[in-house]
Design a protein with these regions (language model features):
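Short, well-ordered beta-strand segments enriched in hydrophobic/aromatic residues
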Residues: 49-55, 125-127
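Core FKBP-type peptidyl-prolyl cis-trans isomerase
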Residues: 59-87
């Protein structure tokens, strides 16, 4: 939600700040950037643990997916779409700039089975259920 050039009334700005602080673990601020956090669903099926993120408008090449043994971290950058001429915003709700989202992963998943794919503006990361095999930190390639 933090964007340069955004204007709003003081109550709205205060709400954005409070929401930003209460949502995160402080990790994004520690990395030096004000980051937005994509909407995320986490669910399981009979055979898999699935993390689904709303990352509409992103180039998958600008998304990094990493698993560090107990959490999945997704980070990247969404650029503002170019528009001809000068823009005068009436409403500005689409987050742009850097983002980071850390999602705890339940015990009982096979870390080595992690697969990521980007389809229709959503990132899906699937882990097979099974024997709890904690994995070392590793990058997960995104199937496009």
């Amino acid at each position: 939600m933090a964007q340069s050039g955004r204007r709003g009334d003081p109550e709205e700005i205060f709400e954005i700040l409070v929401t930003s602080f209460s949502r995160g673990s402080g990790r994004a601020a520690a990395e030096g950037d004000l980051c937005w956090r994509p909407a995320t669903d986490v669910f399981e099926t009979e055979t898999e643990f699935v993390v689904q993120m709303d990352l509409a408008g992103l180039d998958p090449a600008r998304i990094q997916v990493e698993f560090d043994g107990d959490a999945l971290t997704v980070r990247g950058i969404r650029s503002e779409p170019a528009a001809p001429g000068r823009k005068h915003y009436h409403t500005m709700e689409i987050d742009v700039g850097p983002f980071v989202r850390r999602v705890p992963v339940i015990a009982g998943v096979d870390a080595a089975s992690a697969q990521a794919r980007y389809r229709g503006g959503f990132l899906f990361v699937n882990f097979r259920k099974g024997e709890d095999r904690p994995g070392r930190r590793r990058q997960i390639a995104i199937d496009r």
